[in-house]
Regions:
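Acidic, low-complexity/disordered tracts enriched in E/D and polar residues
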Residues: 1-31, 35, 81
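Long, charge-rich, low-complexity alpha-helical segments
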Residues: 25-85
Length: 85
């Protein structure tokens, strides 16, 4: 799973999908996770990085991560290549 190549994101969390013309705003943690996915990091790598940085537990991270992935899927921002996380 990866972010589609044509999707643009600003440092402030503004996402633009040129294919649909839609734009979205995400919070700073969402920006980090978005960029980790764009870099090709695995779920496990992202989990470790987020748990080290933020005061949260694995269950909360897991729920929030999958909610975020659901958002990305809903707005067709993901591209599925070799494998899905």
């Amino acid at each position: 799973m990866q972010i589609k190549k044509n999707i643009a994101i600003s440092e402030s969390g503004y996402i633009f999908n040129p294919s649909s013309g839609e734009s979205f705003s995400i919070n700073p943690t969402g920006v980090e996770i978005f960029n980790f996915i764009k870099e090709g990091k695995t779920y496990e790598e992202i989990e470790q990085l987020v748990l080290e940085k933020y005061n949260t537990d694995k269950d909360t991270f897991d729920k929030d991560y999958h909610d975020f992935i659901g958002f990305l899927k809903q707005y067709h921002l993901l591209d599925y290549g070799e494998k899905e996380n």
